[in-house]
Amino acid sequence: MLTELLAARPDFAPGRWVPCPPVRDRAAWDTLPAFDRWLYAGGQAARDARHIPPLPLHLWLDFTHTGNRARYEHAYFARRRLLCRLVMAECMGDTGEFLPPIADLVWAICEESAWQLPAHNSYVRDMPQLPLPDTTRPVVDLFAAETGALLAMVHYLLGRALDSAMPGLEKRLTGEVERRILRPWEREHFWWMGNGDEPMCNWTTWCTQNCLIATALLHPGSPRRIRAAVARAAYSIDCFLKDYGEDGCCSEGAQYYRHASLTLFNALEILCALAPGVFDCVWQQPKVRNMAEYIAHMHVAGRYYLNFSDCSPLAGVRGVREFLFGKRVGSIPLMALAAADFAADPDPDGLHHADDSEGINLYYMVQIAFGEAEVRAFTASGAATPGDIWYPSVGLRVCRAGAFVAGIKAGGNADSHNHNDTGSVTLYKNGQPLLIDVGVETYSKKTFSPRRYEIWTMQSCWHNLPRFVGDGAVYDQHDGARYTAREVQPLEGGLSMDLAPAYGAVPGLSCYRRTARLTDAGLTLCDETDYPGEVRLTLMSQQPPAVEGTLVRFGTLAEARLEGGLLGLETEAVSITDARLRLAWPDTLYRTTVRFTGRLQIQIG
């Protein structure tokens, strides 16, 4: 798409991308709604910055030695969060008060041996990480690119002030971004840049967005480098877009929307500024609009989203970036969702996000600051709640009826951030989780390794799916492109599919037909199979189940009535101790196991 548009205008006159008014434009900065909030946050950040979190070698090696990512990343991200807050406060106040701690943090980041994370320290996709970084050959990963964009924004906003206060620091800053980000991006090929038919993921647009920010702000007067950056970015984005269906569904789940579709939005905005008139028509492409609106279709109510793969049910709060994306593609529903979320958000600047990796992108903060007034003034006249939708590219059906919202996943087990969850169903009633997808634990060395499916949350037996028992064996789903649902048929208010292929070769199993339908009365789940032995169906819930014969009560929220070849029911409490899971769930979840043969129908309402 983009490379074709660029081929028609190869000699375009480069434009300039301006992320926000310069700090000297006091009329623009002094009237921002966030003015006082950022001055207060800057004071706290200045106190915290008296002790910059250290990044010693033993923390870097923690990933290699123990598989733990969190300890190094906590300190790494804390440095960048402090820098962002101090820069925003200095831009608001424009007094020089925050320049000394800003300089200390810039210097500390420039002194780091590597900007990539230990978990990303490799040059070949899906290969084991190297124990130590090679300082002569930087790796451009997600957060190296984030760091480059952050320092480029510091240069744009405060470069002159920093150089006046600390002569030579500005040269060091720009030199490190050039050496660690721009030259490698221009001269080497990292897997996320795209290579023909090779599958891409959110890394592609996320890294590309940040490399474009760094190029645009460090080399605004270099037509040669701007043109080369535009061409490189256009190719990468095309490689990313090829993996999306026309329906715009994100196979990585709603939580990755902000890292995939929203970074696509920003990358396209920058490209449109750098290459005036070349890419403007992309905003009218149905695929791009569908990608924008995906998050609105996945929204349940309040903070909850339909989730699968590595996605949490708490997939983030919508805000200014979503609003601007919706505005660009003409989506009133997306603008309305973003405006409502932003208005209700007690932390619109993202200062207290539980995810360490959030709050480190200075451009996002500028977007929020300068977009806040428009978002708060928006009135959602004509905005309607999204209806049912079928995403054939991923095999996802979203249905709404009365008090209920259901997500029914067909597809297969080769998604990016895959879990073995083909055929699973999630269900909400009155905006509360009823049948749940647990999500993913804190990332570790095992998460993205050949041992991934040893992690319990990845396994089909911890999703709302069957397992098959026979001859002393228990059969669960397998991971890989060949393990899919077949004969998938979208129905009014539901979906029908055969799940047998997702399990591979199970003796005696050739068909497991699941039909799920949602009405105002609730969800009807009908499973029929030719498997001759016992089937054990998992039902995961947040509400404690109470079994009364063929009735299961899920707290006071709902009840399930079972009929068919029922053999028995068992319930168990599942202790939740992982920090990432505890962000979404209480300390105990529940698994109900329904044992049956032949046919089972469950009416949940």
Which residues does each predicted region cover?
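Carbohydrate-active enzyme catalytic cores, enriched for enzymes
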Residues: S261-L262, N266-L434, R595
